[in-house]
């Protein structure tokens, strides 16, 4: 399951997480099955959070590079 989660896109993981939450909210699953689905949901949540953090870090880096490039351009004009 862990390898499968790493290969999933963020959107796929989110869709699967939503499905698990819906199944758990129905409340008609046996305890063992509910626990298994809950564990899967937690793993997907962590994986998705990591993907979001990586995306945020990439955006921050790109914006910093752009700002740095703009600062250098402004310095050359003066």
Swiss-Prot record:
User: Mind telling me which GO cellular component terms the entry cites?
Assistant: cytosol; exodeoxyribonuclease VII complex
Q: What does this protein do?
A: Bidirectionally degrades single-stranded DNA into large acid-insoluble oligonucleotides, which are then degraded further into small acid-soluble oligonucleotides.
Its recorded name reads: Exodeoxyribonuclease 7 small subunit
Q: Where in the cell is it found?
A: Cytoplasm
- Please describe the quaternary structure of this protein: Heterooligomer composed of large and small subunits.
Pfam families in UniProt? Exonuc_VII_S
Keywords attached to this entry: Cytoplasm, Exonuclease, Hydrolase, Nuclease
Q: What is this organism's lineage?
A: Bacteria, Pseudomonadati, Pseudomonadota, Gammaproteobacteria, Alteromonadales
Location, primary (coarse class): cytoplasm
Which domain of life does this protein belong to? Bacteria
PANTHER family noted in UniProt: EXODEOXYRIBONUCLEASE 7 SMALL SUBUNIT
Alphabetized Gene3D superfamilies for the sequence: Exonuclease VII, small subunit (1.10.287.1040)
Gene Ontology BP term (one): DNA catabolic process
One MF annotation (Gene Ontology) recorded for this entry = exodeoxyribonuclease VII activity
Q: What is its EC number?
A: 3.1.11.6
- Give the UniProt family note: Belongs to the XseB family.
């Amino acid at each position: 399951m862990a390898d499968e989660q790493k290969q999933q896109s963020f959107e796929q993981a989110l869709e699967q997480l939503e499905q698990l939450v819906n199944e758990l909210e129905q409340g008609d699953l046996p305890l063992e099955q509910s626990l298994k689905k809950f564990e899967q949901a937690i793993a997907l949540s962590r994986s998705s959070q990591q993907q979001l953090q990586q995306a945020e870090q990439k955006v921050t880096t790109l914006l910093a590079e752009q700002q740095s490039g703009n600062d250098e351009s402004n310095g050359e004009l003066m």
